[in-house]
A protein has these predicted regions:
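A short glycine-rich, His/Asp/Glu-containing loop-to-beta-strand
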Residues: 5-47
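Short beta-strand segments
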Residues: 38, 64-66, 107
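Short beta-strand His + acidic residue motifs that chelate non-heme Fe in jelly-roll/DSBH
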Residues: 39-40, 59-60, 76, 82-88, ...
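Short acidic-glycine-tyrosine-enriched beta hairpin
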Residues: 63-81
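Glycine- and acidic-residue-biased ligand/ion/polar-headgroup-sensing regions
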Residues: 45-58, 62-63
Length: 118
């Protein structure tokens, strides 16, 4: 069964909203403020696909850094360390499609975090 959620969750780097979820997927729109970045993290139970909707991003995957912009997308496999940073002057928006067996926020192993979260 697919659930359409109405959650808009604030974070120190911006916010995200869950668009839909089921036992095998979750879809979010993520909004990152200019100059902010998410934690450098990895997941044990889910892979992610990111599609950049608007803005400019710096992506780090297992230590490799590259830039992406609107229309670009990337796959992040389970266990791969990753981070996204808004390098533009406007809000960065990307759609995140998660697939796997568990989508809770406790499936985040933070390797580095600008906001002191573990």
């Amino acid at each position: 069964m697919i659930t359409v959620a109405d959650s808009n969750l604030e974070r120190p780097w911006g916010r995200y909203e869950v668009l839909s979820s089921s036992d095998i997927h979750q879809v979010k729109n993520v909004y990152v403020l200019p100059g902010k970045r998410l934690s450098y993290q990895r997941h044990e139970k889910r892979a992610e696909h990111w599609f950049i909707v608007t803005g400019d991003a710096r992506i780090i995957l297992d230590g490799d850094s590259f830039e992406m912009s609107a229309g670009d997308s990337i796959d992040i496999e389970i266990g791969v360390a990753h981070r996204i940073e808004n390098i533009g002057s406007e809000e960065l928006v990307f759609t995140e499609v998660q697939t796997g067996t568990y989508f809770g926020e406790d499936d985040i192993e933070r390797l580095e975090d600008d906001f002191g979260r573990s």
